[in-house]
Amino acid sequence: MGLSRAPWMGRVGGRGMMALLLAGLLLPGTLAKSIGTFSDPCKDPTRITSPNDPCLTGKGGSSGFSSYSGSSGSGSSISSASGSGGGSSGSSVAQGGSAGSFKPGTGYSQVSYSSGSGSSLQGASSSSQLGGSGSQPGSSGSQPGSSGSHSGSSGSNTGSSSSHSSSSSTFQFSSSSSQVGSGSALPTSDNAYRGILNPSQLGQSSSFSQTSGQRVSSNQRPCSSDIPDSPCSGGPIISHSGPYIPSSHSVSGGQRPVVVVVEQHGSGGPGVVQGLPCSNGGLPGKPCPPITSVDKSYGGYEVVGGSSDSYLVPGMTYSKGKIYPVGYFTKDNPVKGSPGVPSFAAGPPISEGKYFSSNPIIPSQSGASSVIAFQPVGTGGVQLCGGGSTGSKGPCSPFSSRVHSSSSISSSSGSPYHPCGSTSQSPCSPPGTGSFSSSSSSQSSGKIILQPCGSKSSSSGHPCMSVSSLTLTGDPDGSPHPDPSAGAKPCGSGSAGKIPCRSIRDILAQVKPLGPQLADPEVFLPQGELLDSP
């Protein structure tokens, strides 16, 4: 019996030992991956990042970004790609479809938003060093995955090339430079293109092509690394896409600026008791924890204290009946293989000034209504431009490395001062280096005055502004009409009461980035010492 049992036990024991041995070999790797998911601080979706975060700069931690693609509402696609090898990375997000859905995406190389039914956005970014770049084409309503749907080039290529198309329009981008090229396109609902180029790529050129066969190209000037908060110095590229004219950034006289705060609402996410006010947990009656998901099934976002007809503080954008902060979120590393929800965390405090201080406001004219649009310093982004109430279909692109000295503005009859040249499809590229100087563009309501704060060229009664902060409109005679959305007032020695200047950085430094609270209206009142001389 013992002799007959021994072989049986030997067989069983051998199999058992083999199973244990295999388990011992496999489980540590699996456990290590699982544990690494939670022990690696770069993969913690609840962490709060900053522009100098090693997880974003590639100096330690986890430098691998996984792509995310998805669809939202009645037809939009989301795709992103990021480069490796250090430097800055980027992501792109397109928004469209049902009202209330908001899918922000930011990277320290570019920030892009697209709105409008049936639109799609594809982004490609690369690091400032020789990293990889790629793109994910998407079509309206599709949901390309993060594998098998890539196009473009990767690795340490010099001069990458990729093409993207959507159901309603086509954009082609090609770059050739001494470094890795990068770019993205944002086709909008009216087929107007808004391209984003990385100014840190010297000698980069871009080409815009529409389905009608019209093709224009322009060269981008390099920018210096000593420009504060510019993309060359590590700041973000912030641009907008969508129906800027006339449904975005509406401005009408007489109202005080309103700070809008996005408050999170929902029924709770995975592992969270249903009914809590925050999608990712938190105590009832308390502000929500750092936001880690923007998936609408886990709770959306709504505006507290603002509406589409209120003034917008610089850094806020309006889309589909809601107002959202730009640069409010920063994209963290999503865990590879995680569910199809990208990880987002609350960004660094606004007081750092990285997201807002480099956003001069470029007023535009559309019929009788005045609208404003944000155009950051040195982004090379494009704006809708041209005469008439509908604006031009072509890009209006002031490729400058500093504050734009010319505004892309024209009257309904087409102004000779219009950088784009009437309503043509050509991009506008104002001459010079784009240094901040006095300039004006004719329009039906008056002039655009660009003067630095405290400049000796500021005459009595004219607005004085901090460099890279504000642009004000005025009457035909040059008298200013400060734009309250910028928190600006006529200031300087020539103004009544000698009101000091306020910069966007000063204003937004006092706006808390999280929570349902509204900023004290006194934040927007002039403060500080009087400015009598430069």
UniProtKB/Swiss-Prot annotation:
Keywords: Secreted, Signal. GO terms for cellular component: extracellular region. It is found in: Secreted. The keyword tRNA-binding does not apply. GO terms for biological process: cell-cell adhesion; skin morphogenesis. InterPro entries: Corneodesmosin. Residues 38-252, 396-497 are annotated as: Disordered. Residues 1-32 form the signal peptide. The keyword Signal applies. Its main location: secreted. GO terms for molecular function: protein homodimerization activity. Residues 64-82, 107-185, 200-236, 397-415, 431-446 have a biased composition (Low complexity). Residues 454-472 have a biased composition (Polar residues). Important for the epidermal barrier integrity. This is Corneodesmosin. The gene is CDSN.
